[in-house]
Swiss-Prot record:
It comes from the Bacteria. This protein is a non-specific DNA-binding and ATP-hydrolyzing protein essential for bacteriophage integration and replication. The keyword Cytoplasm does not apply. It comes from Haemophilus influenzae (strain ATCC 51907 / DSM 11121 / KW20 / Rd). ATP binds at G98, M99, S100, G101, V102, G103, K104, T105. The lineage of its organism: Bacteria, Pseudomonadati, Pseudomonadota, Gammaproteobacteria, Pasteurellales. This is Mu-like prophage FluMu DNA transposition protein B. It holds the Pfam family Phage-MuB_C. InterPro entries: AAA_22, B_transposit_C_sf, B_transpositn_C, Cro/C1-type_HTH, ExeA_AAA_ATPase_DNA-bind, Lambda_DNA-bd_dom_sf, P-loop_NTPase. Residues 18-37 bind DNA.
Length: 287
């Protein structure tokens, strides 16, 4: 089969668009279209090398990797759902914090997808200042022409979310400075929505310092209605993942899975390990 026929077969089987294939292969979309129609006039050898490499990569992925389920409901995800539901219903401030790799982000993403008026933004080193996190929220709300002035932007967001009975979730909230947290707290109270800060232990420990009335976080701490700590992967989480992958009766696999989830990174490492299982029903042991 010629390379052109292989590419056409791949497009048909995978339902991928030509534009997406071109992006992933690193070739110009027009060049790909011309090549598939056998009338490309440019450097054919260069284009064919990139397209052949693309097909080889896809073959390796299909042979060596297994696509994990988009979402697996676990005991931990249900615990997080309860906190999110509470914050939205009670229009209050809550936190979800703890070890990385235990499923916090997957849970909040699933909740945001399946509930109305739930907005999820992610903070980062470059998106942690007050103006940047407000801009992220504006984009999440569909305000594409959002102004960059902090005061104007904050008032615009507050008007947009007021009366919605909604929920704002900020992932990686440990990146946010005091100024940004205070602004979100005031906005949450004025708009009458729920606000959940998600991240590592710093999300909680910083605000807990506010237990002292003289501490700068005192106003924040006094308004936190619920703190949910997740410090390790639950055994029930591992069992739920095993069941989703059809391994619940494989005692050897269950033991290895449990040992993996007991390390830092927990479910994330387990998912990556299973994805690389070489097409077999065997979990790799990780040193």
């Amino acid at each position: 089969m010629t390379l052109i026929n292989k590419l056409k077969q791949h497009l048909s089987d995978s339902q991928i668009t030509q534009a997406q294939l071109a992006r992933e292969a690193g070739v110009n979309a027009g060049a790909l279209s011309a090549y598939l129609n056998d009338n490309y006039k440019g450097n054919i050898a260069d284009v064919e090398a990139k397209l052949a490499a693309y097909l080889e990569k896809k073959a390796v992925q299909a042979r060596e990797f297994v696509e994990a389920p988009a979402f697996i409901e676990t005991a931990t995800s249900r615990q997080i759902f309860k906190t999110l539901e509470f914050a939205q219903i009670a229009n209050c401030l809550a936190t979800v914090y703890g070890m990385s790799g235990v499923g916090k982000t997957k849970a909040i993403q699933e909740f945001a997808k399946s509930h109305a008026n739930v907005w999820l933004v992610t903070a980062s080193p470059s998106r942690s200042s007050l103006s940047e996190i407000l801009y992220e929220i504006a984009l999440e709300l569909g305000i594409s022409d959002a102004p960059r002035r902090k005061g104007t932007l904050s008032r615009l967001i507050a008007r947009k979310i007021k009366g919605t009975e909604g929920l704002l979730i900020v992932d990686e909230a440990d990146h946010l400075p005091y100024e940004a947290l205070e602004e979100l707290r005031i906005m949450q109270e004025e708009a009458g929505i729920g606000l959940v800060l998600v991240g590592n232990d710093k999300v909680y420990t910083r605000m807990k310092g506010g237990i002292s009335p003289s501490h700068e976080y005192a106003r924040l701490w006094s308004r936190v209605a619920k703190n949910t700590s997740i410090q390790k992967t639950k055994k029930a989480d591992t069992q739920a993942v095993a069941q989703a992958w059809g391994l619940e009766t494989d005692e050897e696999a269950l033991k290895v899975m449990q040992s993996i989830t007991e390390t830092g990174g927990g479910l994330r490492i387990l998912t990556q390990t299973y994805a690389c299982r070489n097409g077999s029903k065997r979990i790799w042991q990780v040193d």
